[in-house]
Swiss-Prot record:
Subcellular localization, as worded in the UniProt entry: Nucleus
Keywords in alphabetical order: Isopeptide bond, Nucleus, Repressor, Transcription, Transcription regulation, Ubl conjugation
Organism of provenance: Homo sapiens (Human)
Record protein name field: Fibrinogen silencer-binding protein
Domain of life: Eukaryota
Any further remark recorded for this protein: Intragenic, in the second intron of RAB54B gene.
Length: 299
């Protein structure tokens, strides 16, 4: 059995030998795709690499293809981390980078570009964090001073705009009632507030003087209802006919629903009867089949 488990850690010479064996197949191994043919080709390459690696030295412990593949991935990750660390410290690459990392950079030049992109993203994220902190601090300062401004504005509004008078003299109340009665005869709105502002709002916003039918039924007083209609028997007759039509439609709809429910019940009963009949037929067929068999006839 070849190398069930690794007996010791990889030495520097073993790592360099692995990278030397991987170099001819690096183009296939670095092709990141889920195609079945590529995966099969990668497995074949790793089997060849494992055979060549185990044939280098007898004194070394045998390694599996999976173990060598794991080591190769770790070497690439370590190379990325080492490059990022060197860029952060701004030291010389050639003097401080290890030999496996140099080999990985020669085989895979994309690693250096990956580090540059990652470094740029790190700088951008740091700038965004600084901007967010600055925005938060400025917002906190604004919130600290903003309540005072709100208090001043409210006080100014209270000083400029006096409260509406709650007590009206008799002449003003009579004029208000006359205007309200005149307006209610011609315009029916949703609100019948006796205040002056609501009356003015209805006068400016209502485009027509045709009364609305849905507001006629809101009043409980019969006299008030008849006064709004202006004792017009034609309107009363139309409303009565419309009400009768609505009741008739509701009645017909109820009958339709009841008939549909009865039809569904009848259908379910017929289906149950049909199922029972089929069961009886199958039983009769089974009895006839048993009687036709020779073993039953002999009995």
């Amino acid at each position: 059995m070849v190398g069930k488990a690794r007996s010791s850690n990889f030495t520097l010479s073993e790592k360099l030998d692995l990278l030397k064996l991987v170099k001819p197949y690096v183009k296939i191994l670095e092709e990141h795709t889920n195609k079945h043919s590529v995966i099969v080709e990668k497995n074949r390459c790793w089997d060849i690499i494992a055979v060549n690696y185990n044939a280098i030295g007898v004194d070394r412990p045998p390694r599996t293809a999976q173990g060598l593949r794991t080591l190769y991935k770790r070497l690439k990750e370590y190379a990325k981390q080492e490059l990022l660390q060197q860029k952060e410290t701004q030291s010389d690459f050639k003097s401080n980078i290890s030999e496996p990392t140099k080999k990985v950079m020669e085989m895979i030049p994309q690693i250096s570009s990956f580090c540059l992109v990652r470094d740029r993203n790190h700088i951008q994220s740091a700038n965004l964090d600084e901007e967010a902190q600055a925005g938060t601090s400025s917002l906190q300062v604004m919130l600290d001073h903003h309540p005072v401004a709100i208090t001043v504005e409210v006080k100014q509004e209270e000083d400029i705009k006096p409260p509406p008078p709650l007590v009206l003299n008799s002449q003003q109340s009579d004029t208000l009632e006359q205007r309200e009665e005149h307006e209610l005869v011609h315009v029916m709105e949703r609100s019948l507030s006796p205040s002056l502002s609501s009356v003015d709002m209805r006068m400016t916003s209502s485009p027509s003087s045709i009364p609305r039918r849905d507001d006629f039924f809101r009043h409980e007083s019969g006299e008030h209802f008849r006064s709004l209609l202006g004792y017009d028997p034609q309107i009363l007759q139309m409303l009565k006919e419309e009400h009768q039509i609505i009741l008739e439609n509701q009645k017909n709809f109820g009958l339709y629903v009841q008939e549909k429910r009865d039809g569904l019940k009848r259908r379910q009963q017929l289906e149950e009867e049909l199922l029972r009949a089929k069961i009886e037929v199958e039983k009769l067929k089974a009895i006839r089949l048993r009687h036709d068999l020779p073993e039953y006839n002999s009995l």
